[in-house]
Amino acid sequence: MNKRLIVFLILGILLVSALSAVPSIYDIISEFPESRIDSFLEGDTVKYYSIDGNYVPEIAFDGTMGKSKAIKDYNDKDTFTLGLATFIKYPESWASLSFEEKKLEIINTLLSVSTIKGIEYISHSAGDKPKVLFSDAYTLVDKDSKKEAYDVEFSYAPESYSYELAAYLKDSIFGGNKYLINYEISESEIFMTITNYSDLKFMFFKAMSKGELNMCVDAVMTKEGIALFALATVYGRDPVVKTPITDVDLPSAFMKRITSLKNWFVTEINK
């Protein structure tokens, strides 16, 4: 057999194998609330709060790291969780990209910490007007440094990889703080977790100790588009932090954060 033909056959087999490993969106939403599936597939965001009696893992995607974490955290008696799910069609500009090129775009979007700066949330107290949530954001040289570093950028999409970086995020409620951001990359999933590496304070009052907040963004590549699940978990704290000045509603505060992170991701991949 012609050597060139053999090479093409091998490449074809590898391509078919890679594509067959990518799930359909319909294969990973077996627990999703049936009444919300149609609107979810049209791009609506579904939000769940454990303190409202919602089973948050229900809106995470089957067989994913996000699902495993949602189940684990939901079942922890000393935590409360809140999550959201949305579906994002691949941008038209990605039509000519290979699977690996699309995956690389997603990875580098989630690595681009500096682009979080300026993302907004809708403030109901300000008359449903947008307000800046993160006024500053950048990658740090390491977790024990205050020195700003360039955003990390991968040159190729690994099939499987773990990576950690430190970041500085300044938000409208807790001010400037260090966070550790971990990335777990698998064949068709990029799982990003953000954990506070410093105490979170509201004015002069400590709202959360180091490590008590964990947020995640789980991007799952499907044949039809990107299934996105975001989760916030608060460990060992009451839902409301009371101070002599005012009360801080943590579920509301962190739903704003994961909603803003979702909006940031959607905006960045569509640029």
Stretches with model-predicted labels:
Residues 186, 193-200, 232-234:
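Generic short beta-strand segments
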Residues 218-220, 225-271:
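Long, compositionally biased interface segments
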Residues 8-17:
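Bacterial N-terminal signal peptides
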Residues 23-172:
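Hydrophobic ligand-binding cavity/cleft-lining segments
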Residues 1-4:
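Positively charged n-region of N-terminal signal peptides that target proteins for export
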Residues 178-185, 214-221:
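Hydrophobic/aromatic beta-strand elements that line small-molecule binding cavities or substrate pockets
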Residues 175, 207-215:
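Amphipathic hydrophobic-ligand
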Residues 200-207, 240-245:
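Flexible, membrane-facing loop/turn or short amphipathic-helix motifs
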